[in-house]
Amino acid sequence: MKATADYWVSRSTYNKEKDRYEIRDVVSADEGSRGVHNDVATNAGAITTLRLAIRSSQILGKPVNSEWQTTAGKMYVPYNSAGQYFPEYEGAPAWERNVGHATPLISYPWEYPMSDAAKKNTFENALKSIATLGGGVLMAPALYPMVAVELGDQALIDDCLVRSYRPYLRPPFNAINEGARPRGENVSFVTGTGLLQQFVYGYTGLRLSEEEGVSRKYKPMLPTPIKKLTLKNVTIRGRKFDLVVEGNTLKRIGGEATKIKE
């Protein structure tokens, strides 16, 4: 974590005129735009990484690099206050305001703070771009159900479950393709962590927490076709238990308690 935080400090440039740090000349997290400045997902990820390094150092009693704090505190993340949404990157043209399918991922996994309106609008912009331009690569839609649960939108959860896998299946064996297009991307993609996170952190409403290891941050919600979800042998800090989501309620079976801390 120290090395990663040091990297983001070295990669950031201080803009004296605007009193902020910027990350310039990057490939967007969506991989579709090259040589852009202040990609939203990149900068939000850098902030979270720096803050995790700071907190980890404090817990371990290690020195905290003051540059981590300064850079995280003044890192620029483009935001359209009039429209209440995050664009893909600084200066993205109006027609491309959120073509980046990865932009909603600043909600999850980066947990960048924002209003519910900004989260909803940014997500809807991405969904509109998918409808117009195609489904994009698997990385982003696989995590969309997490954002849908955060918004508490049942119809959106149902829609995002289908979006997260169906466009990427290829016959005759339903192999996973990296992209939604019928050809041109990697076939038999085996990185299934995005899909797995839907069930561990998405429909349960859980997030990692410093105090308990894991705690409930959002209301648990299942896609309509799924009536019950059981996660068995969850082990956190020496405690082993099962998690059950049923009827939009979450129960813990076994371990030291029967209720996840809210």
Located regions from the model:
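Solvent-exposed, flexible loop/coil residues
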Residues: 25-31, 36, 40, 45, ...
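A glycine-rich phosphate-binding loop feature that marks nucleotide/adenosyl-phosphate handling sites
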Residues: 24-26, 65-75, 180-181, 215-225
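Non-catalytic C-terminal accessory modules of carbohydrate-active enzymes
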Residues: 155-262
